[in-house]
Amino acid sequence: MALNSSTEDGIKRIQDDCPRAGRHSYIFVMIPTLYSIIFVVGIFGNSLVVIVIYFYMKLKTVASVFLLNLALADLCFLLTLPLWAVYTAMEYRWPFGNHLCKIASASVSFNLYASVFLLTCLSIDRYLAIVHPMKSRLRRTMLVAKVTCIIIWLMAGLASLPAVIHRNVYFIENTNITVCAFHYESRNSTLPIGLGLTKNILGFLFPFLIILTSYTLIWKALKKAYEIQKNKPRNDDIFRIIMAIVLFFFFSWVPHQIFTFLDVLIQLGVIHDCKIADIVDTAMPITICIAYFNNCLNPLFYGFLGKKFKKYFLQLLKYIPPKAKSHSSLSTKMSTLSYRPSDNMSSAAKKPASCSEVE
């Protein structure tokens, strides 16, 4: 959406260079429906994840701390999703005022960064737990995990500030509607390109490279360990899990990141064609649905890689309350296999534990 502005009576009025871009009847029906599904599934699933980790698993492990914070970040975002559903169903007419516009927009940005940062830290933790279990024991503590999560929330909050500052309610004169949108006073401004590149690089590229590297090193270490033990089926299981984790992250976010970059080019006036603007504005909410639906499934996806999580999750669904006294040992490895390949790899007698165990 390319916008030009003027101010009257304290209300920002803008002109939309491509007023019909992204405005299709099927979008106004399909997207609110998808948002509603994401809201129901996400609230239900992430609430159960919080209950399982906090009340059943007792939040005793590093991985559970990251997973709990991941679910909480998703819940914060999901609470604002009904606003976006109504906004889209009303054909991009924002009825909730400027403050909720800023809060809802910041929540979307916050969830993006918090979730990606937490998944990145989770991959690093899995790498340390599997490949360097003894060396990392002193670093992989509950205190370090909690401090890391606090830092992540602060960083995500800082990354969301532009939404609080620059996202506002505007009145589009040539379409006679009120929207909640980003608007930049000058097309020569470096702000939109800076925000777009930050989202592309800090919100996707760097985290993806770290996640890819971490799980590649994990797979190599486990492959070596299982070759020593001649356990090929086990090695194949690990490879599939790791590939699923990496590809799940990649394909969830790539479409949204691509169209975010194109949207920046439109805002800067690099792209003038309204047909391209229409494609971008039409595709953007669809890519958001893909990215954030998968995002909200992440806690369940990662949690179900662990046998203990699955056990407690099924107990919760059957209304079986948590035991008053927690188990003395608790799996913390997510897709990590309580087996530690760096511990006496040459010992063929040592049998690896479940490859899907979440320590």
Curated annotation (Swiss-Prot):
Angiotensin II binds at residues 15, 17, 167, 182-184, 199. Gene3D superfamilies: Rhodopsin 7-helix transmembrane proteins. Keywords: Cell membrane, Disulfide bond, G-protein coupled receptor, Glycoprotein, Lipoprotein, Membrane, Palmitate, Phosphoprotein, Receptor, Transducer, Transmembrane, Transmembrane helix. It holds the Pfam family 7tm_1. The gene is Agtr1a. C-terminal Ser or Thr residues may be phosphorylated. It comes from the Eukaryota. Coiled coil: none annotated. It is a multi-pass membrane protein. Residues 56-61, 126-141, 217-239, 305-359 are cytoplasmic. The chain crosses the membrane at residues 26-55, 62-89, 99-125, 142-165, 191-216, 240-268, 279-304. This is Type-1 angiotensin II receptor A. GO terms for cellular component: basolateral plasma membrane; cytoplasm; dendrite; endosome; Golgi apparatus; organelle outer membrane; plasma membrane; recycling endosome. InterPro entries: ATII_AT1_rcpt, ATII_rcpt, CCR1-9-like, GPCR_Rhodpsn, GPCR_Rhodpsn_7TM. Residues 335-359 are annotated as: Disordered. Disulfide bonds join 18-274, 101-180. GO terms for biological process: blood vessel development; brain renin-angiotensin system; cellular response to dexamethasone stimulus; dopamine biosynthetic process; drinking behavior; G protein-coupled receptor signaling pathway; gene expression; heart development. Its main location: membrane. A lipid is attached at residue 355 (S-palmitoyl cysteine). PANTHER family: CELL ADHESION MOLECULE (PTHR10489), TYPE-1 ANGIOTENSIN II RECEPTOR A (PTHR10489:SF956). Interacts with MAS1. Interacts with ARRB1. Interacts with FLNA (via filamin repeat 21); increases PKA-mediated phosphorylation of FLNA.
